[in-house]
């Protein structure tokens, strides 16, 4: 949890339908394994204590009591584990049955978050058993005598890392036009968890992946999606255990479908908060959310997530070429506007290196977009003390192949005069030696541009201006 990184786990146990004792033991084992691997946020699927596919057994008191007893067992026996857990179960509140996520940590239930949107179309009929928790806001007394909130609008805030603020939604909630995760994020949630039981249809995995990725991007948040898998009844549906962990549109980790197990990745909470600060249109609203504190130990987080050493350069050749063409077109369109507005020609200094080559290619593309002859581009080579035959030959061939006007100005004599004027020893190859040549080249380009009614085009970094 140092430097803003928090390890998360999305867990799919191989449950037995309606066997709450078996499921509780299995879930407890996976909770222990997750924390052994350093996970601090551990998310299980929707209704995992009973199974999603219990159908009318959900209406039986024995199953509901078994689920409640199983929850209390998990809470008690996980008290020594340093993590916050999210486990799904059916829960009766005020005589009605809700599909809830129980949230607990260090032997204490922090709250119950009910599902808001109950699918009752196509292959789904949740409204047969459950009621919506969209308007639920009450206190529930648990078997141990503790009273906890049952409310959709709960935020779980880490005392040791206040930027770690977690909001909860369940399965269908994400698939609706107005998911609860939107209000959670606007109330400050940096991490969103989804306890799901999403069945498989041909092509549904792609839609699910895009949904999770898109929601994390839209809300500048991390999104942990844990779905039901093996063990559920296959009478009507098949569940694949498709788990996903995403961060601001990037899929950090994704499980292989049609299995069970634990998916891990690390979430960069500080990065998410920094991105929200930069986006001035991301305005947190004064919500009615209730904040509930929990504690975690601050420990080193071993990073397993992929860190791209070249984040702007796609490894796939086709995508790389597409990205390069996009960059070239963006630059060329910007230059095209200036050329059309001024009616000017262009002057480009060519050394044979990457920067000047890019400047010339962008200029050529801009002239093509304007429908202008490349002879309006003056390409200038300015050999100096360090110019090699290779870079010089590259520069000349490039200019000739693109059909630009070729001009050569040797700067050695003028730079030597300048060295004499300022008392610089030509044998001392220091910053003055290097920058004197660069400034001489810039002066030449500016003067030629004045003569030709042209703009000087170059790729430049702020450092060059120092």
Per-range role (PLM):
Residues 328, 332-336, 364, 378, ...:
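Generic hydrophobic alpha-helical scaffold/packing signal
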Residues 193, 346-350, 354-396:
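ATP-dependent adenylation/pyrophosphate-handling site
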Residues 1-349, 365-374, 406:
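Enzyme catalytic cores with a strong preference for nitrogen-chemistry domains
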Residues 193, 199, 220, 415-424, ...:
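Nucleotide-activated chemistry modules centered on ATP-dependent adenylation/adenylyltransferase
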Residues 40, 51, 77, 82-83, ...:
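N-terminal beta-alpha lobe that positions the nucleotide/phosphoryl donor
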Residues 217-218, 361-367, 447-452:
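Alpha-helix C-terminal capping segments
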Residues 262-264, 293-311, 372-432, 438, ...:
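A conserved beta-strand->alpha-helix junction
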Residues 91, 346-356, 414-415, 459-465:
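A glycine-rich phosphate-binding loop feature that marks nucleotide/adenosyl-phosphate handling sites
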């Amino acid at each position: 949890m140092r430097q803003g990184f928090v390890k998360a786990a999305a867990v799919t146990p191989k449950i037995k339908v309606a066997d709450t004792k078996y499921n509780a033991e299995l879930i407890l084992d996976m909770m222990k394994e997750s924390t052994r691997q350093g996970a601090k946020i551990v998310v299980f699927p929707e209704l995992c204590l009973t199974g999603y596919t219990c159908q009318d057994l959900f209406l039986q008191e024995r199953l509901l009591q078994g689920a409640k007893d199983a929850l209390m067992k998990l809470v008690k026996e996980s008290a020594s584990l340093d993590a916050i857990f999210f486990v799904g179960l059916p829960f009766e509140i005020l005589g009605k049955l809700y599909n809830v996520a129980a949230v607990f940590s260090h032997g204490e239930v922090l709250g119950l978050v009910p599902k808001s949107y109950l699918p009752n179309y196509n292959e789904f009929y949740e409204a047969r058993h459950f009621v919506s928790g969209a308007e639920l806001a009450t206190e529930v007394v648990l078997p141990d005598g503790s009273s906890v909130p049952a409310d959709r609008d709960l935020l779980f805030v880490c005392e040791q890392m206040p930027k770690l603020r977690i909001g909860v939604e369940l399965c269908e909630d994400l698939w609706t036009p107005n998911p609860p995760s939107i209000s959670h994020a606007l109330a400050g949630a940096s991490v969103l968890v989804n306890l799901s039981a999403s069945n498989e249809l041909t092509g549904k995995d792609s839609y699910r992946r895009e949904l999770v990725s898109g929601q994390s991007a839209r809300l500048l948040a991390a999104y942990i999606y844990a779905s039901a898998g093996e063990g559920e009844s296959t009478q009507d549906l098949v569940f694949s255990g498709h788990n996903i962990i995403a961060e601001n549109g990037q899929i950090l980790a994704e499980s292989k479908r049609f299995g069970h197990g634990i998916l891990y990745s690390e979430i960069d909470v500080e990065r998410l908060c920094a991105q929200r600060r930069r986006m001035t249109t991301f305005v947190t609203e004064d919500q009615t959310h209730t904040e509930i504190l929990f504690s975690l130990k601050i420990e080193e987080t071993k990073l397993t997530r992929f860190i791209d050493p070249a984040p702007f350069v796609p490894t796939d050749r086709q995508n790389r070429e597409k990205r390069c063409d996009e960059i070239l077109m963006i630059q060329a369109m910007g230059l095209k506007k200036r050329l059309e507005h001024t009616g000017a020609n262009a002057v480009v200094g060519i050394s044979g290196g990457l920067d000047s080559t890019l400047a010339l290619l962008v200029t050529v593309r801009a002239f093509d977009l304007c429908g202008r002859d490349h002879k309006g581009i003056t390409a200038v080579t300015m050999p100096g003390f360090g110019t090699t035959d290779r870079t010089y030959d590259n520069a000349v061939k490039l200019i000739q192949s693109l059909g630009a006007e070729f001009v050569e100005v040797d700067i050695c004599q003028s730079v030597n005069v300048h060295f004499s004027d300022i008392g610089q020893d030509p044998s001392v190859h220091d910053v003055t030696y290097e920058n004197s040549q660069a400034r001489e080249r810039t002066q030449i380009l500016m003067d030629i541009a004045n003569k030709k009614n042209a703009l000087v085009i170059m790729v430049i970094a702020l450092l060059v201006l120092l």
